Amino acid sequence: MNDFVGPIVTVLTAIIGVAILAVLVSRNSNTAGVIKAGSGGFSSMLGTALSPVTGGTGFAMTNNYSGF
C-alpha cells in the first residue's frame, strides 16, 4: 500500500508547492498583507495561549478586526 500512496502524496505536495509559489510571485497577490495578517493572528493566538502563565487577559488588541 505504501508503494501506491507515496508517489501520490509526492505529486500532490509538488502541485501544492507550485500553487503556493505562483501565488507568492503573482503581480496581483498581496503577499505582504497576507503575511502581516497571518503573523498578527499568530501573535494573538500565542498571547491567548500564554495568558494563564503571564497573567495577561488573553485578548490581544493588535489587529484591525477587534471591535472592543
UniProtKB/Swiss-Prot annotation:
Compartments where located: Virion membrane
UniProt entry keywords in alphabetical sequence: Capsid inner membrane protein, Membrane, Transmembrane, Transmembrane helix, Virion
Main localization category: virion
One Pfam family here: PRD1_DD
Ribonucleoprotein as UniProt keyword: no
InterPro entries, alphabetized: DNA_delivery_prot_P32/34 (IPR020085)
Keyword field contains Membrane: yes
One CC-aspect GO term: viral inner membrane
Signal peptide as annotated in the record: none
Name listed for the protein in its UniProt record: Protein P34
Species per Swiss-Prot/TrEMBL record: Enterobacteria phage PRD1 (Bacteriophage PRD1)
